[in-house]
């Protein structure tokens, strides 16, 4: 550096390489790569924790409180949905399924009676759907 100052005093123009300090330019590439590896040794959680320091304490505490509240609400909603699903399912099984089964049973009985009537009285009686004991419809007019 002293040579650069002495040369500057002599009035000779200096190259930019002479003016810049010789820092990392003299290090071999292997040492530079090792320096990069040393910087990357921190984990993702450490990096994220380090990033929180760039926000003010007030913002960090507000974000933490918002996260805690969101977690609390999600847990409450999960518990409520489990209870509501249990109540809805058991109520459906107790109140609605017996009605559905009885309706199916009634339809099956009606279908069996219709089939018996077709077998005993002939194929046209099943289609008429008339009342029992009523006169059968005319064969040409349906």
From Swiss-Prot:
The keyword Oxidoreductase does not apply. GO terms for cellular component: membrane; mitochondrial outer membrane; mitochondrial outer membrane translocase complex; mitochondrion; TOM complex. Residues 27-42 have a biased composition (Acidic residues). Residues 104-142 are mitochondrial intermembrane. The chain crosses the membrane at residues 84-103. GO terms for biological process: protein import into mitochondrial matrix; protein insertion into mitochondrial outer membrane; protein targeting to mitochondrion. Residues 123-142 are annotated as: C-tail signal. Coiled coil: none annotated. It is found in: Mitochondrion outer membrane. Keywords: Acetylation, Membrane, Mitochondrion, Mitochondrion outer membrane, Phosphoprotein, Protein transport, Receptor, Translocation, Transmembrane, Transmembrane helix, Transport. Belongs to the Tom22 family. Forms part of the preprotein translocase complex of the outer mitochondrial membrane (TOM complex) which consists of at least 7 different proteins (TOMM5, TOMM6, TOMM7, TOMM20, TOMM22, TOMM40 and TOMM70). Interacts with TOMM40. Interacts with PPP2R2B. This is Mitochondrial import receptor subunit TOM22 homolog. It comes from Homo sapiens.
